[in-house]
Amino acid sequence: MNKYLDQLGFHLVGYGCTTCIGNSGPLDKDIAECISKNDLTVASVLSGNRNFEGRVNPHVKANYLASPPLVVAYALAGSVLINLTSDPIGIDTDGNEVFLKDIWPNNSEIRNVVEKNVSPEMFKKQYSNALDGPKEWQKINTSTGDLYNWNSSSTYVQKPPFFDNQSNDDKEIKPIENARPLLLLGNSVTTDHISPAGAIKVDSPAGNYFMERQIRQNDFNSYGARRGNHEVMVRGTFANIRIKNQLLSNVEGGYSILEPDKKKMSVYDVAMEYAKREENVVVFAGEEYGTGSSRDWAAKGTKLLGIKAVIAESFERIHRSNLVGMGVLPVQLKSHTINDLNIQSSDLINIKLTEDLKPLQELEVIIQSNMRNIKIDCILRIDTINELQYYKADGILNFVLKNILKN
């Protein structure tokens, strides 16, 4: 079928991690400028496995997943604003309307193609040496030994700091006091908003990190490819170009506001400045916080930014568990919504914690400012005794290591 797909503009141009990670190339310059200038919401249809906004391309907000034949059909139609079951997808050379049903193969046709072209031997042959890798992979020099030989100059793999303060004792459970709101987010914030896996912008904190090390923009690669380097990943946390921090008005992207300076900066830079001042930070969010793929770096990056707690209306199950696993406190509003709280960047947040912490216990969160002092009833979303042990150990990684050292 390749020659017919080529005629339609569907060329086989390579293989690898491309469209679903945002690596399939830029839009035509004029089209991209038109989208930005007019703030258009444009759509893509893809047969990949990710449809987060801005993921396929930073200019494309709406992405729809479909089978490969439907991707071709929508491309022929040129719009997602049609009903494929009743609207024509194009006009043939004789001026007749063409419908999806006219070009859609029936089961018999599909079965005949499969029987002629697919066999068990194909899979046996391809998978028999799959773990050997191509010649290029086999030529890579590797070292052996019990301990990994960290290369301090590598921009792909760096020694992570999760065990730097490892202790055999549980951390002291004490109140979170005078915490600054780092972000105020809405509903259905995905793990891709929290820790994007796509392209790295040159003017982002991660981009600056590479530029300081003389890495060319063409060699930035993606956040997904750089997940072995915590310095890149922490700079990419909350750096999605489509995230909306409601502490700032009419601003899209990974920005926050530094208090009391009232200075707009990247989320990373604000978090690092608060860390220098030894000030705690928290995140506020609406419903379904952390929905989407179960991305470990969404919790790891949150931890490395110094975020002590995420206060939300509700949590996605796996991300909530991952936050606990990194020693970050998930706190769920009991009867309020985020909008009820009218959170401001100048507020100070206090969460009352004691040594006798229990799973799913009620917590009191106090929001303070010059104008108000309100108490909010919340629920601790550490759901089990095991999770409580992880939190007390400052995360599951430290918990596991502590038990290994004990034994």
Feature-to-residue mapping (PLM):
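Non-catalytic terminal/interface segments that mediate subunit docking, oligomerization
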Residues: M1, Q138-I311
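Conserved phosphate/anionic-ligand binding catalytic regions in large, soluble enzymes, centered on
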Residues: Y15-C20, N49-N83, L182-I200, E288-G301, ...
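N-terminal leader/propeptide and maturation segments of large enzyme subunits in energy/redox metabolism
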Residues: L76-W150, R226-G253
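Mobile "lid/hinge" segments at catalytic clefts and subdomain interfaces of large enzymes
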Residues: L8-Q126, V324-G325, L329, P359-L360
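Short helix/loop capping segments that flank catalytic or ligand/cofactor-binding pockets
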Residues: I21-N23, E53-V56, Y74-A75, N83-T85, ...
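Acidic, glycine-rich flexible loop/linker segments
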Residues: D92-N107, R320-Y390, N398
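Short hydrophobic alpha-helical runs that function as membrane-insertion/retention elements
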Residues: L12-G14, K308-E313, P330-L333
